[in-house]
Amino acid sequence: MKAEIWTIEQCPYCIKAKQLLDLFKVEYKERQGFHPDWKTVPYVTIDGNPVGGFVELTSFLRNL
């Protein structure tokens, strides 16, 4: 499983999302800025599929 995460500096939920990905041992590539299809950060895709922000990522990983 590989993820991409769009973040900006000093974003607390971006930091939490990266920590969550680390906790679940999900390899990820970090991209700075906003995803063109999403207006908030963080924004996460896993294996090319949209997941959403921190809340959606938490739910996704808990349901693995």
Q: Whereabouts are the PLM-identified features?
A:
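Thioredoxin-like thiol-disulfide oxidoreductase module
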Residues: 24-40, 45
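Non-catalytic, surface beta->alpha helical segment in thiol-disulfide oxidoreductase systems
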Residues: 46-64
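Generic alpha-helical hydrophobic packing signal
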Residues: 3, 32, 39-41, 58-64
